[in-house]
Curated annotation (Swiss-Prot):
The active site is at residue 312. GO terms for biological process: cell wall macromolecule catabolic process; cell wall organization; peptidoglycan catabolic process. This is Membrane-bound lytic murein transglycosylase F. Residues 457-470 have a biased composition (Polar residues). It is an enzyme of class 4 (lyase). SUPFAM superfamilies: Lysozyme-like (SSF53955), Periplasmic binding protein-like II (SSF53850). In the N-terminal section; belongs to the bacterial solute-binding protein 3 family. The N-terminal domain does not have lytic activity and probably modulates enzymatic activity. The C-terminal domain is the catalytic active domain. It is found in: Cell outer membrane. The gene is mltF. Residues 1-18 form the signal peptide. Residues 268-482 are annotated as: LT domain. Gene3D superfamilies: 1.10.530.10, Periplasmic binding protein-like II. One of its GO terms (molecular function) is peptidoglycan lytic transglycosylase activity.
Length: 482
């Protein structure tokens, strides 16, 4: 009997050893050891984030966002697949990180000593602060002592720790932590006048202002703090070391700067009147032209084409400038003839020709310019001509920059209006500063359309879910009554 028992124990030990050899990550996931090895064995990197217009979102059925693109590049360097895990708030994110169910938390997370004690942290790659947001045209408090109504925050214990410290200075400070709504949803409720104040990340407030200009910033709650990725706490530093090397390389190669330009560059510019007018136009004018933008988009995103048209004419088919350009895409007579259209004020002809002209400009660019950046170069040419774009690229090279990099060329565009520079260029003087602002505006307008529709879709999804829940509750009540 004793021999049988020993044989059973031995067999079980061999079985567990075999399972561990075949599926080692099943054990490693739930320990603090060999986390980097577990990722390699699993073949995928689990990154937790929050769905919003900066960190992560779905656009045209593909994943986008600052944190997504940076995480994808990191996964590529590790030689593994990327799998994004989406959470509603930071506490859900940190809870899963603490359980080792994700490998990284990446959602523009501000540094906090409490979190630094609980987790490993990656290198700083940006900065932000906590701000008090209120609704424009309401009384603006000067400090926390002036706040007389409810302050709302999302589920964020680190922020609560900060507020508890501030409470020593402002004893009357009270806040409400909403565990049901995301930070973005709280800001949207604030914009609609449903709640009076929200404390949120400065990056998220600036992003939401692009589609909800009613939002205003009262003051900073904290000084700017570094933004980091957080990793599970572990005696092993392999993953943290790999992340440090990756971030250093991302800084050196310009990847970080390019992502900041792509996702954060446009949100630094905010004009209440312009944004309010634009959002009204998106709601009331764009729907009548969006089918045409979609029809003639070609290889472009139709929302970019729409943004170009708004920058050109504010979606006015009869627009005319003193220089003779006309129509919703503001085409010159020569461009109209080149694109073979007869009536520049006909919206369909104008949009078709404008799109074809943009595609033609893109085709004239050297192949050395990356696909994703080619449109920005083409827009400069659309605004001030292909010759001046050639000059801007040549000037960038002369000044030691990369003529194929949009960030490098962009900063030199204003120099086309300075005599010491344009006098040495083939095509001479150009209002390069206007071309610079032209592209910036279009990027901002496009992102606003994307995020306006994203918010609308999310609200529709939430409304449908609430309706289904209400119907289910009614059915349960009816069953109980029967």
């Amino acid at each position: 009997m004793k021999g049988l028992f020993l044989r059973i124990i031995t067999a079980l030990a061999l079985l567990f050893w075999a399972i561990d050899m075949v599926f080692p990550w099943q054990f490693l996931r739930h320990t603090e050891e060999n986390h980097y090895t577990a990722i390699q064995a699993r073949g995928s990197l689990y990154v937790g984030t929050i769905n919003n217009q900066i960190s992560y979102f779905i656009n045209k059925d593909s994943e986008r966002g600052f944190e997504y693109e940076l995480a994808k590049a990191f996964a590529d360097t590790l030689g593994v697949e990327l799998e994004m895990k989406i959470f509603d708030n930071q506490e859900q994110l940190f809870d899963e990180l603490n359980k080792h169910n994700i490998d990284l938390a990446a959602a523009h997370l501000l540094y906090h000593p409490k979190n630094a004690e609980r987790f490993q942290i990656g290198p700083a790659y940006h900065s932000a602060s906590w701000q008090l947001a209120y609704r424009k045209n309401e009384n603006r408090p000067k400090n926390l002592g002036n706040v007389k109504k409810d302050i709302y925050i999302s589920n964020n214990l680190a922020l609560e720790e900060t507020l508890k410290e501030l409470q020593k200075q402002y004893p009357q400070l009270i806040w409400k932590r909403n565990q049901a709504l995301t930070q973005e949803e709280l800001l949207l409720q604030l914009a609609e006048g449903k709640i009076p104040y929200v404390i949120a990340n400065s990056i998220d407030i600036a992003a939401i202002q692009q589609i909800k200009p009613e939002l205003a910033i009262a003051f900073d709650i904290t000084d700017e703090a570094n933004v980091h990725w957080y990793l599970p706490n572990s005696p092993y530093r392999d993953l943290q070391t790999a992340l440090l090397n990756f971030m250093n390389n991302a800084e050196e190669t310009g990847l970080l700067d390019n992502l900041k330009e792509k996702y954060l560059g446009h949100i630094s510019q905010f004009d209440y009147v312009d944004t309010r007018s634009y959002m009204n136009a998106i709601e009331n004018i764009l729907p009548q032209f969006s089918p045409l933008f979609e029809k003639y988009k070609g290889e472009l995103d139709w929302r970019l084409l729409a943004a170009v048209a708004y920058q050109e004419s504010h979606w006015n088919p009869d627009a005319t400038s003193p220089t003779g350009v006309r129509g919703i895409m503001m085409l010159t007579k020569n461009t109209a003839q080149h694109m073979k259209i007869s009536d520049r004020t006909d919206p369909e002809q104008s949009i078709k020709a404008g799109s074809e002209y943009l595609h033609w400009l893109i085709s004239q660019l050297p192949e050395s310019i990356e696909k994703e950046e080619r449109i920005w170069f083409a827009l400069v040419a659309y605004n001030i001509g292909l010759g001046h774009l050639i000059d801007a690229r040549r000037l960038t090279q002369n000044l030691g920059g990369n003529p194929d990099n949009w960030l490098n060329v962009k900063k030199n565009l204003p120099l086309l209006a300075e005599k010491r520079y344009y006098s040495q260029l083939k095509y001479g003087y150009a209002r390069g500063y206007e071309a610079y602002q032209y592209v910036e505006n279009i990027r901002r307008y496009m992102n606003s359309i994307v995020n306006y529709h994203r918010v609308q879709e999310n609200q529709t999804t939430n409304d449908n879910a609430n309706n289904e829940s209400a119907v289910k509750n009614l059915e349960e009540i009816k069953e109980n009554e029967d």
